[in-house]
């Protein structure tokens, strides 16, 4: 059963590779943006230890910072996957960084957290020279990247989690978080029949936490609801849509936040508002009106937090 599930997972992400290549080839990137591509944040030569920087062309001086963690089920994608999305954010007047990180099964989720932190430490050292204002930082991610956004934010605020994940805290705080269609509950994906869903989740947990996952020291310290309690998290924006096949994950996150002390807002698309507002639509199809609206509202939320107007 486990081998069959692994083949299903791999086939799914192989299909995404082809679909995303077609999607990106069909799109015209946003204009008026300077891009620095493939900058190494580790000196080991690993192709996934690289990042991209984006800034609006012709604009000098420090700009508020957006850090984007791409999705892809923890086992697919790189810094180029969300390139057009990051360019759109930069075109609106922001300094944007998006990194590659090693994928499972090469590493567990701990290795991914380590890579994200390493890229952020690089930004702490080099961001100012590229015009990144690190007193105003929005951390955002979509799908699995949304999960990593919540996890990285928690690790940054918890010495115990820093020890577990073997990272050093950053010298700057996150001003706000934006979790887009986040798959933040890794213990139950809620996609198929209960039997198949349990099998899929079990195999993913082996990949993410190490086999056997039930004996992993990461168990109980990886989902948002594991790590968030008791931490002084910054304001959180949740982006959710009913046509999203992972909508149950967004519903669970929204319910959790509604019963928590964490300040948060929601951008929600109903099926009636847009039937094509599917999983991570605003990232994959940056030029749709729904996407522009969502991304502009995300940046408005960030601006509101930075002005101190969020309540």
Regions found by a protein language model. Give the residues of each.
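Alpha/beta-hydrolase superfamily serine-hydrolase fold, recognizing
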Residues: 1-311
